[in-house]
Amino acid sequence: NRRFFRLSPLRKQNIVSKIWRAGYPVGIHFIISQIVAGTALAVFARTAANSAETYYNYTIFLTGLTGILAMIPALYFYRRDKVRRIAGGLIPAQKKVPLSLLEIILLLLAGAGLAQYGNFLMAILQSFINSSAYQESMTRITEGKSLLMMIFWMGIIAPAAEEMIFRWLIYLRLRDWLKMPVAAVISGLIFGIYHGNIVQGIYAS
C-alpha cells in the first residue's frame, strides 16, 4: 500500500538517494562537533588568556559532549529506520533474543583479537607512518587528566555515539541494499576516513 512504499527502504531509490541516505549521518556528527568546538573557542577567546591551550584542556569533555548531543538524532533516526524496515519486511516485528553468557564472552574475545590485529598492523606500518604528531597531540590532550574522566568521556560516551552513527545508521542503511561483507567494509572505511588520520583510521575500521 501507499504507506508501505513511503516507509520501506525497499522502495525504489536512485544511486544519489542511496548515497545521501547512507552518508548524511556523518554530516550530523560533523556539524554537531563543529558547533561544540566553535562555541567553546568563542567562550575561551573571551574568558581565557590562552584560548588554544584552554581548548586542549577541555578537549576530552568537549568530545564527550559532542557524543551526547549526537546520540539524540542518532536514536531518532535509528528508531524511524526500524519502523520502516518492519513495514518493508526487512526485519521481523519480534522481540530481540538476548545473548547468552557464552556469546558475550566470545564477542569480547573477538573484539580483543581484532584490537591485537590492529596493533600488529600498526607495527608493520610504523616504518611508513609518521604518527609522532598524533601521539604528541594525544599526550597534550590527556596529560594531567583523571583516568576515570578519560574512560567515561573518551572510552564510553564518544565511542558509543560513533557506533550509533556509523553502525546503527550507516552500516544498517547500507545493509538495506548491499550484502553484509560489502556494507561492513564500506561503513568501516567511512568510519576510519572520518577520523582524519591514519592511526585512528586503522583502529576505527
Language model regions located:
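N-terminal juxtamembrane cytosolic/stromal segments of multi-pass membrane proteins
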Residues: 1-23, 82-90
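Hydrophobic alpha-helical transmembrane segments
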Residues: 19-27, 60-61, 101-109, 148-152, ...
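Alpha-helical transmembrane segments in multi-pass membrane proteins
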Residues: 25-82
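Aromatic-anchored segments of alpha-helical transmembrane domains
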Residues: 30-35, 112-117, 188-197
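Membrane-interface elements of multi-pass transporters and channels
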Residues: 35-51, 80-85, 124-136, 168, ...
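Juxtamembrane helix-loop-helix connectors linking adjacent transmembrane helices
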Residues: 53-57, 86-161, 176
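Transmembrane helix-loop-helix hairpins at the membrane interface
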Residues: 145-205
